UniProtKB/Swiss-Prot annotation:
It is found in: Cell inner membrane. Belongs to the MscL family. The keyword Transport applies. InterPro entries: Mechanosensitive_channel_CS, MS_channel, MSC/AndL, MscL_channel. Its main location: membrane. The chain crosses the membrane at residues 16-36, 79-99. It comes from Caulobacter vibrioides (strain NA1000 / CB15N) (Caulobacter crescentus). This is Large-conductance mechanosensitive channel. Channel that opens in response to stretch forces in the membrane lipid bilayer. May participate in the regulation of osmotic pressure changes within the cell.
Amino acid sequence: MSVVKEFREFIARGNVIDLAVGVIIGAAFNGIVKSLVDQVIMPPIGLLTGGLDFSKLEWVLRPEDPASEAIEKVAIQYGAFVNTVIQFFIVATVVFLLVKLVNEIRRQDAAEPAPAAPPAPTAEETLLTEIRDLLAKKG
């Protein structure tokens, strides 16, 4: 089997296509969540904290020396980290709710009883069937 044919079979499997779609949708969803956090959630929080922009919060370990170009500022930018943590919790919550929904649907599908088998023929019906078959053979 050629490599190209094997690759086509691999790509044609439903799981690979589903995974690719999931990755693409996940990347798009990440952009939406980032925008939600940066442009919708954090501005009101910044307003409540006196106009503080969380994405700019940092701990300066070594300040920049304007007299020397060789000494740059070294800082831990924990504000951006706070934004990223909020984004993570939003994504994790949405994924959790989706998984919970899918599991509930699967549980409901599994709980649905299979269609009942037709009742077994009575002794009278069995006897009549045998008589019909015998008459059909005699013709």
